[in-house]
Amino acid sequence: MVVAAQGIESTSSEIIKLRDTELYPQLLELIKGLTCTWRSMYEAHQVQTHIVQQLKYLNTVPSIESTSEIHRQATLQLELQVQQWHFSFCNIVKAQRDYIESLAGWLRLSLFQFSKNTMSRTSEESKIYSLCEKWHHAVDKIPDKVASEGINNFLTVLGGIVVQQGEEHKQSRRCESALKEFEKRVYELKAIESKYSTYSTLGATGNDPVKEKRVKVESLRAKAVEEKTKLEKSVSTTRSITMNNLQMSLPHLFQAMVGFSSVCMHDFESIYNQQSNKKEHDDVKRIQQ
């Protein structure tokens, strides 16, 4: 029994040693790394915000050209990438929360279990406990919902653009089909006119094949013009929806990301500086003793 107790005590002491001499410095370096990461993200999102804010000064000449297949595929690819961005963003926030929650939970258990008197923790225990508690509090209050909604709203905008481009593509095919049918009937009309040009086409019933063909061709001409007008309107709608929605949604998106990354950067920087100052203070005290 005594041997078992000594073994447990030895193991506990080793865990405490690893926690204080190995885990704590690594966590501090991780916090420092997260500070640098979010500072880089903050600076990048600031630049992106400045760029997209210039969209309101962009004057474009309305194009009558239909959206190309390459353009449509690029829009679909952008939508896919933003979906992945939203998924990855939500995952990384959840992973950070899960990580620090598990770490803080384990630390609380280890402090209560390994320390006979929880009110008299050593300075090393206090440092790692303080670090994890502040970290836990920081990730709990970061404004990830605002940033997530910003990405999701932009995704909705892209979805609307994709739908409109699809409608335009359908109208383009209808226009092309109407034009081909019209051209086909014009060719047939010319053939009939050439065939019956040398004599009267009126039969016993008084029917005129050429006249009937001309009526049909005129009907198809009107149909082709109508479909072309619809296509031009659809192209104009696509351009308007794309430009207006991007001008409105992109600044909101990157402003949300600037806000999120700013909070993360400052929170992690504050935690790191506080813990580093504590470490320097403790080092000075050891030297003076």
For the regions a language model picked out, list residue spans one by one:
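Extended alpha-helical coiled-coil scaffold domains characteristic of the BAR superfamily
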Residues: M1-Q289
